[in-house]
Amino acid sequence: MEPLAMTLYPLESTQPTRNKTPNETTWSSEHTDDHTYFLVSLVICSLGLAGNGLLIWFLIFCIKRKPFTIYILHLAIADFMVLLCSSIMKLVNTFHIYNMTLESYAILFMIFGYNTGLHLLTAISVERCLSVLYPIWYQCQRPKHQSAVACMLLWALSVLVSGLENFFCILEVKPQFPECRYVYIFSCILTFLVFVPLMIFSNLILFIQVCCNLKPRQPTKLYVIIMTTVILFLVFAMPMKVLLIIGYYSSSLDDSVWDSLPYLNMLSTINCSINPIVYFVVGSLRRKRSRKSLKEALQKVFEEKPVVASRENVTQFSLPS
């Protein structure tokens, strides 16, 4: 069974060599000539790069650092990486620029960014879920640098997973050995048995919290953007990974299924591009209609109000009688 490059990267670099002749690039001629697809994809990536770049700048220089904004900053960096590498790959394949080194690094860093985004979204969901289930611990016992440490560990995990996928399954350094199969199994377990279930379960709890509105002072906007971002990721970004995994284990997929891969890749770039828009729109929502600057909207949406009625109650509850 031929290894099929997994995770995010699409038809441009990872599709098996069907419809391929020495005079063609990795895409079939049908997709290479599809200038509409190329232009739309490039516009999406360009807007996403601008939006995430602006978000990164605001989070670093203009908005006070908080536990939640640390996660959002790292997520924006991961999305920026995916969009940049996707843009490079589209330009390389459209203009027939043959550069294996550039292509290899673009694939590696895009897989790296995709995996990191998945891990960070799960961490964000789990942490907010814990703030709902254990509000006193979150206010009083949560380690000060937990967000930064968690982000570093998740980046390290992504380096491991992405490096294994790239080394054994994409570059095929040792194609005569079955390591790629084990890498796929490890990646599938990590994704579909650990991170995705945690993400979904945590967001179900947040959804119940928002619907029941048991504690009015809870940062509802924060929960809304978390749930929206996760739903967008599951709808737009996950189908690519699922299809490529199925393609690795099934040699009987119809060509029409492979033809959908470039469009699934476009959906994944939409997912990376739309997050800053979600933050701004949710941050701008207000009962009183008033225009807000981008900075004010972001500050509003990233506010973390106390999750209990008052600090006195927390102190009274936590001190021995």
Curated annotation (Swiss-Prot):
Side Extracellular, residues: 1-35, 93-102, 169-188, 247
UniProt entry keywords in alphabetical sequence: Cell membrane, G-protein coupled receptor, Glycoprotein, Membrane, Receptor, Transducer, Transmembrane, Transmembrane helix
Places the protein is found: Cell membrane
GO molecular-function term, one example from the UniProt record: G protein-coupled receptor activity
Topological domains annotated Cytoplasmic: 57-71, 127-147, 210-225, 272-320
Lineage: superkingdom: Eukaryota
Membrane-topology annotation of the record: Multi-pass membrane protein
GO cellular component: plasma membrane
Transmembrane segments: 36-56, 72-92, 103-126, 148-168, 189-209, 226-246, 248-271
Glycosylation sites: 23, 99
Role, per record: Orphan receptor. May regulate nociceptor function and/or development, including the sensation or modulation of pain.
Annotated family: Belongs to the G-protein coupled receptor 1 family. Mas subfamily.
Protein name: Mas-related G-protein coupled receptor member H
Species: Mus musculus (Mouse)
Gene from which this protein is expressed: Mrgprh
